[in-house]
Amino acid sequence: MYTLSVSSLNEQIKALLEESFSRVLVEGELSRITFHSSGHIYFTLKDENSTIKAVIFKANAAKLKFQLQEGLKVILDGAITLYKPRGEYQINCFSISPAGHGALALAYEQLKNRLASKGYFESSRKKQLPKFPKRIALITSATGAAVADMLRVAMSRYRAIEIDIYDVLVQGDNAAPSIIRALSLADTKGYDIIVLGRGGGSIEDLWAFNEEIVADAIFSAITPIISAVGHEIDWVISDFVADLRAPTPSAAMEMCLPDEKELYQFIDSLVARYEQMISQKLYGVKQELEHISRLYQDHSIEKKISYKLEEIAQLKLSFTNSIYFKMQSFNKEVESIKIRFPNAIQSRINIVQNQVLTLQKMLESNHPRLKTKKGFAQISKDSKVIDIESLIVDEVFDLMSDRVVISAKVINKKNI
């Protein structure tokens, strides 16, 4: 028997293990998981009685569809190898799948729960879609049936819409990066709405819309986004993150575009309603103007002047009649005196008659109405006769003759 070095022994054991256990499937529970900065993942697989160390290197770790979690039961597909520096054997994993659960289904639930805890699905952060969009970006496969359906529905509903198509991969390993690039570009172009769309398929076909990087891009976008992936029964992560989920691509167009025919009918009804409102308003204004006009006529300056002139005429008539009756009485008295004292008082009678005539002329000459007939004008303000000396510069007053009333303004005032 010969002596072996530690390194030599570990080397022989490593060769035996790798030859004997080149491919194994091992089921157990994940424990003591370490995500190394290199991208490798180190962990322990255990059952009720024992444990074994395991590693999945970066290249294979990147292919995992779900996140490794403590206590998760999994099936490892790999090979037994020995880590010579410490003489520890471990499982070098080629792939890992959940035990009793599909890897994609588990990854879907894990990501959904993680994004929900981060607030990605909160209704408060959902952006409102415009009622009348002008420009829409469709991020989809330019050769798929979904884009044809979306364009057909759009043109039948709202021909004024402008649509740009961003051709992307919608399935496969490169689909998610393709979608992100198109979404990032479209988000800078000022579209009213962005639609992520594709037709139905298996969970593998739709998986690009379940990727976390796609969810992050949707969440960060400033443009309202509609997720229209698959059929009505298909739910993907983008449906929860987007501002609106449409059950199908065609439904997305129906949900974001107004119906042109219904819009025209609405406009017609709106015009009719406003015409009726305007007509009623105009009628009300007309009635109000007529009322104001009547009030103006009842309270106008001309009306007041007319009333005052009538009063003056009545006063003049009353005054004239009074003078006439007094004169008649006086003349009778004079005649009586003349008869009784024909000679002695004749001269006195003549004097009195002259005084009476003079008084009558003075009365007539001082009457305002008679003065205005001779070219004079009466000064008044607010229908009241005033003294010219009381007027000041810029004051407005009325000049009244026997036929007209003129409104005037004091421009200058001088004493003479």
Curated annotation (Swiss-Prot):
Enzyme Commission number, as recorded: 3.1.11.6
Cellular location(s): Cytoplasm
Short name of any one Pfam family annotated for the protein: Exonuc_VII_L
InterPro entries cross-referenced by the UniProt entry: Exonuc_VII_L, Exonuc_VII_lsu_C, OB-fold_nuc-bd_dom
Catalyzed chemical reaction(s): Exonucleolytic cleavage in either 5'- to 3'- or 3'- to 5'-direction to yield nucleoside 5'-phosphates
Any one Gene Ontology cellular component term annotated for this protein: cytoplasm
HAMAP family given in the database record: Exonuc_7_L
Protein name per Swiss-Prot or TrEMBL: Exodeoxyribonuclease 7 large subunit
Lineage of producing organism: Bacteria, Pseudomonadati, Campylobacterota, Epsilonproteobacteria, Campylobacterales
